[in-house]
């Protein structure tokens, strides 16, 4: 690459680094130094494959009473387990630290299989049908996985967070089987190896200021708890509470403004809290309880009656510790579990089978507020509809250029939606996903002169973050190009209004509304279909329906419909009315 081409990218990286702050940069620097010096690798030297039994031959407790439909779901899940040996295009014998996790292909599906979500499922099956051989299948699965993945080699050992989630799944499975207080030797060796792996790259986890910073100390806590290592347990507890204090605001907003990663946050917190109570361990240091409850209430206010969440922010399809077997598209089990544990309330899903497995008592119903504001977002509820606005402040790096993005749901029906994620490392023919799904054009907001408000500086990194300010009924931003955009939201019954006021030196602008599923047709003032949308402005507008793209699930992309309003520089405001049926 010629030096002239490198200069702009270097400037973008410098800008992004300045915004991340000295603390994150210092921690990442320590991580790189530990890798380069061999210190991290030395911490992982001399490891052997677990050789003893993973499960003890102990009597099984009866399973909770469960509907036949749920039991059929478990049978289907067991029939679709991934193979124990699954490395995708990655070398299973390569040293895990420093592996190239991008050039060979997308590591995300490989890691999903390596989280061993099958362990709690096999434990559930063993309790439901004790004569069907599922306990032996769980033992065989762990033996086969360890043989296929020697310690600290291959993609499944490349990430501390993945090691933590895998250890948590084993801890949960052992607890369901009643074997977590005195694990068998193979399970103890397995947990000890995972604690070593997590501990080898803690500076990296802390530098991320995202779910890594939560999951990895949670994994250390669980390993210490089951290994009866009080020092490791307490270290994990302190680090987890410190991360929660930094990354979850008192209002429940998470540093990663993403419904998918917020769900993963709650799932991880719920499992370690349940394990802590089960073992009678000391409470997590403050402000763990307060922040966990606030985070649970934030997501409870967004879930649809069928468990679907808005696709706000990055979505990787995680459904961690999914005892309800609901999958990534149904978050009811995650939210109900977290609400009962942390808020002492129900999210409105009292017949939740995952809570039955954990023997969580029923709780009074939680009523979400009609209006709320949290770090990074604000929302409204009116007459069965829910709205969400992506706001500031930008204390942590934004994953997508989704500022002032607005979503609207009518019950379980999405009316205005987010485009989703695509994939983190798609196939060469689909590389356009990386730019498209993270762009402002993939969100319900305004772009000026066809330019992005934040240039991308890396796969998960943007530079030149806009300045955001809060408004009583919305938020406003000013980007690095001098463009100004203020968005205000109001509702009267079933009629919603979004008023956009703009300024700055622009020649053209485009307002995009990404329409939910259904038959939409153009009208003189907008579009009609599952809702009636009309757009007005103080200057002439060009309105059209056009085809776009959305990602309903990780790795999946399909066509969708957009309503686009275009205008010239003389425009100062646009008002959109959405009438719900």
Tell what function each PLM region has:
Residues 29, 157-159, 208-213, 308-316:
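Short coil/turn segments at secondary-structure boundaries
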């Amino acid at each position: 690459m010629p030096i002239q081409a490198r200069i702009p990218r270097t400037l973008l990286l410098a800008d992004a680094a300045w915004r991340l702050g000295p603390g994150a940069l210092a921690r990442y620097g320590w991580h790189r130094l530990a890798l380069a010096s061999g210190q991290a690798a030395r911490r992982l030297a001399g490891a052997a494959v677990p050789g003893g039994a993973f499960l003890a031959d102990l009597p099984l407790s009866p399973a909770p009473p469960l509907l036949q439909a749920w039991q059929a779901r478990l049978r289907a899940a067991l029939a679709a387990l991934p193979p124990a040996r699954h490395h995708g295009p990655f070398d299973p014998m390569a040293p895990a630290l420093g592996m190239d996790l991008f050039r060979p292909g997308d590591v995300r599906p490989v890691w999903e299989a390596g989280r061993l979500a099958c362990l709690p499922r096999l434990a559930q099956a063993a309790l439901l049908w004790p004569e069907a051989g599922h306990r032996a299948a769980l033992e065989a699965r762990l033996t086969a996985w360890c043989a296929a993945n020697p310690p600290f080699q291959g993609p499944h050992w490349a990430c501390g967070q993945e090691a933590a989630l895998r250890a948590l799944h084993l801890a949960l499975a052992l607890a369901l089987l009643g074997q977590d207080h005195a694990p068998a030797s193979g399970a103890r060796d397995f947990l000890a190896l995972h604690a070593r792996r997590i501990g080898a790259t803690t500076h990296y986890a802390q530098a991320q200021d995202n779910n890594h910073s939560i999951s990895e100390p949670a994994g250390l806590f669980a390993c210490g708890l089951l290994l009866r290592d009080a020092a490791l347990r307490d270290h994990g507890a302190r680090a987890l509470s410190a991360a929660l204090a930094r990354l979850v605001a008192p209002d429940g907003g998470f540093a990663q403004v993403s419904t998918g990663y917020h769900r993963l946050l709650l799932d991880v917190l719920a499992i370690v809290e349940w394990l802590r109570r089960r073992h009678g361990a000391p409470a997590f240091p403050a402000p763990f309880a307060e922040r966990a409850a606030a985070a649970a209430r934030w997501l409870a206010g967004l879930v649809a009656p069928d468990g679907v969440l808005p696709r706000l922010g990055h979505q990787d399809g995680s459904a961690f510790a999914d005892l309800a077997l609901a999958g990534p598209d149904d978050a009811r089990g995650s939210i109900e579990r977290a609400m009962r544990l942390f808020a002492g309330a129900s999210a409105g899903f009292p017949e939740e089978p995952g809570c039955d497995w954990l023997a969580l008592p029923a709780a009074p119903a939680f009523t979400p507020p009609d209006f709320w504001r949290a770090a990074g977002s604000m929302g409204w509820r009116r007459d069965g509809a829910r709205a969400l606005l992506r706001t500031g402040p930008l204390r942590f790096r934004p994953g997508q250029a989704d500022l002032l993005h607005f979503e609207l749901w009518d019950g379980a029906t999405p009316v205005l939606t987010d485009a989703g994620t695509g994939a983190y490392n798609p196939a060469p023919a689909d590389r356009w996903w990386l730019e498209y799904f993270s762009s402002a054009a993939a969100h319900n907001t305004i772009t000026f002169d066809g330019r992005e408000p934040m240039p991308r500086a890396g796969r998960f990194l943007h530079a030149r973050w806009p300045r955001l300010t809060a408004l009583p009924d919305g938020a406003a931003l000013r980007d690095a190009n001098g463009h100004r955009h203020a968005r205000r939201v109001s509702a009267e019954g079933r009629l919603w209004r979004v008023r956009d006021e703009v300024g700055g030196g622009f020649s053209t602008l485009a307002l995009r509304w990404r329409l939910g599923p259904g038959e939409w047709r153009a009208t003189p003032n907008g579009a009609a279909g599952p809702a009636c949308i009309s757009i007005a402005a103080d200057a002439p507008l060009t309105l059209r329906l056009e085809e776009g793209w959305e990602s309903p699930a990780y790795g999946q992309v399909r066509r969708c419909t957009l309503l686009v309003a275009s205008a010239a520089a003389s425009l100062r405001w646009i008002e959109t009315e959405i009438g719900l049926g």
